[in-house]
Design a protein with these regions (language model features):
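Transmembrane-helix motifs of polytopic, lipid-linked glycan transferases
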Residues: 89-117, 157
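Short acidic/glycine- and proline-prone juxtamembrane loop motifs at membrane-interface regions
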Residues: 36, 61, 137-150
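Start-transfer (signal-anchor) and selected internal transmembrane alpha helices
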Residues: 1-24, 107, 115-126, 215-223
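Transmembrane signal-anchor helices characteristic of membrane glycosylation enzymes that use polyprenol
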Residues: 7-36, 131-136, 185, 222-237
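Perimembrane helix-loop-helix junctions
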Residues: 2, 195-225, 232-233, 238
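Membrane-interface alpha helices of multi-pass inner-membrane proteins
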Residues: 134, 161, 173-190, 200-201, ...
Length: 267
């Protein structure tokens, strides 16, 4: 028995509303939380507002999240007391964006596999949104002042595009959307560049029998370059070498070589 499309839409809307409520409650409860990385992102956001690009372009901190913070600070112009709550408002906006991208991904999966069969569609919708809320609040953590939620959004969106490519949608528009997702994902965090190789390789493999697939993948790469290229060029000029970021060096030192994260405190 097929689940009526209107019923599925209402259920989806209800689950999305519940997810937004959970996100809003968590963002409000953590509105005064802050940690060291968040302070650095705020410093970069303030540099962006001053148009101090020498300070804003940084090989360790990626630019997309500070740009969101700068936009919010520029719009609301909060006092010192309200500055951190505005930061968590940005986190909630990032959470809502991630929710929309997750919906796009889940809709693609369900439309290809369940065709609104009841109760399967209802069960998978409920399970999917429950996992999204849990992972966003506990693993990605909406309370943490970081770009991780924007990275999650880009991965959800790219995954949704890949699902549609696997299903046979090989249009230029879908490959353009893949480039947009991966380009902004890189601006959120540089490691998305490595993920981009995986996504583009899978897209190429799954659409390999489609005439003109190379041109479509090249379109994805071109759009990525248009989005990320200016930042890479500025960063490379500032660093004196071609680079997409240097955060991997510190993380390799901390997590592979086990270099102490903090200097000796004298105890």
């Amino acid at each position: 028995m097929a689940a009526p499309a209107t019923t599925v839409k209402r259920l989806t809307a209800g689950l999305a509303a519940i997810a937004l409520v959970f996100g809003a409650v968590e963002a409000w409860a953590s509105r005064f939380d802050m940690y060291s990385d968040g302070v650095s992102y705020l410093d970069i956001a303030e540099a962006m507002l001053r148009r101090d690009w020498q300070a804003a372009v940084n090989a360790y901190w990626s630019p997309l999240y500070p740009a969101f913070l700068a936009a919010a600070l520029g719009i609301f112009k909060p006092s010192g007391y309200w500055e951190f709550p505005v930061v968590h408002l940005v986190n909630f906006v990032a959470y809502a964006i991630a929710l929309g991208c997750f919906h796009y991904f889940l809709k693609g999966v369900l439309s290809q596999n369940l065709q609104h069969r009841a109760p399967s569609a209802w069960l998978w919708l409920a399970l999917g949104y429950a996992l999204f809320v849990w992972s966003s609040l506990r693993l990605v953590d909406i309370a943490t002042v970081s770009p991780d939620m924007l990275v999650a959004a880009s991965v959800y969106l790219a995954s949704g595009v890949l699902v549609r490519i696997i299903a046979g949608n090989h249009s230029f528009a879908i490959f353009a959307l893949l480039g947009i997702a991966l380009g902004f994902g890189f601006l959120a965090k540089a490691p998305v560049l490595a993920l981009s190789v995986v996504f583009l390789s899978l897209a190429l493999f799954k659409a390999r029998r489609r005439a003109g697939v190379i041109s479509r993948v090249l379109l994805s790469l071109l759009i990525m370059a248009v989005i990320a290229g200016p930042y890479i060029a500025r960063l490379s000029a500032a660093s004196g070498k071609i680079t997409t970021g240097e955060s991997w060096r510190l993380n390799a030192a901390w997590y592979i070589d086990h270099v102490p994260r903090y200097h000796w405190q004298g105890n």
